[in-house]
Amino acid sequence: LDAVVGSVGSGTTLRLISDIKGVKYTEGRFLPYFFPDVFHENGDPLKEAKVNWVTARRAILRSPVDRIGYGGYLKLALDFPEFIDYIEKVCDEFRTLYSHVNQQVPLNLLKVGVINSWGELRRWGTHLVHHAIWYKQIYSYTGVMEALSGFPFDVHFISFDDIRKDPTILDDMDVVMNIGSAYTSFSGGAEFDEPVITALRRYVDQGGGFIGVGEPTAINRNGKFFTLYDVLGVDKELGFTMHTDKYNWKVHPNHFITEQLEHEDWGECVNDVYALPETEILAEKDLHVNLAVNEYGKGRGVYMNGLPFSFENVRLLYRAIFFAAHKEEEMKRWYSDNYNVDINVYPSTNSFCVVNNTYEPQTTTVYKGDGTSFEVELDACEIKWFEI
């Protein structure tokens, strides 16, 4: 291939394109397409363009495409001059971003592995169906991937076969994740055989972090549904053990992970998830555990019922990953205390940027790598660049 051109509907779909290596260039075709479904008398293409650009920009700052474009019937855009003016600004901003981040390796604070049946074969392609279209069955999981697409983490996609061939592949990860509904290729199902189970338990027991979202490691076997129930500290009641008393329903609201959580949104609820006796429940509703943490040997397990994309949920996952990695004390390094604002660092150019991901002015405290901090005020969608 000389180049790869693809539709960009989110940060995840942008990384799907931009992370492809070995081609002369990559290009993202941004939304909206110039089609009558958006460009009509009552349509609002400007709003769609704004949401699309700001969402994709998080990922561009981690791994940029080389070119951006729009497609469709150009004549339709002529009736929306404000849209045309905004796209001009987007193009100018992209050129500025590209001049800063092209060929630069951004600072990665942690290394995170996503475990599923596909591994690198579907890098950033988990749960996706036809671009970034919303589906009731997957939005609780695509929010996790969308958050990861803009995090300052080195994200790897690991297949079950990868683990079987070399279990030590896990040792280089700060945290590994398993995300999805039961009996899908993304959660794994029967892929959790003895070599995989042993490798993951050993990894966490020796100090690793494991985060499960939805129905992780799920297969109805040996009287349990979540294969790594002992690591996660939770399991799902299928109706076979209803007379086994489940006493642990106490919620611990004050925790490192939930420190900035004000509005809970777990998406499509996985019903009947309960906690084991030693597990610490952080969020629960109607006798369904939504968020829980568990100690396993030297490591930690974290369970989340789901995670639709919002900047508040992005921060929740960010904190959960640092907690699972036993690195809470390191979180406030290159960190914004306002979850609507991101920070990206580029050591090779001695620069970093502070990014407002909203269309409202934002104020934040920025914590640098040495722990010192300063205040920043940002206009709507603004990016400010600084020297390290």
Task: List the predicted regions and their residue ranges.
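Glycan-processing catalytic domains of CAZymes
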Residues: 1-171, 175-190, 194, 212-214, ...
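A glycine-rich, often tryptophan-bearing local segment used as a flexible ligand/cofactor-contacting loop or short
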Residues: 188-262
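Active-site Gly/Thr loop motif
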Residues: 265-276
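A short helix->loop->beta-strand "cap" motif at the edges of active sites that frequently abuts
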Residues: 23-24, 206-209, 299
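Extracellular ligand-binding/catalytic regions of CAZymes and related secreted enzymes
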Residues: 46-55, 64-111, 147-150, 180, ...
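Conserved beta-strand scaffold positions in the cores of enzyme catalytic domains, especially
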Residues: 155-157, 210, 281, 301-303
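Residues at the C-termini of beta-strands that transition into short coil/loop
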Residues: 116, 159-161, 214, 267, ...
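Surface-exposed loop/turn positions
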Residues: 174, 208, 380-382
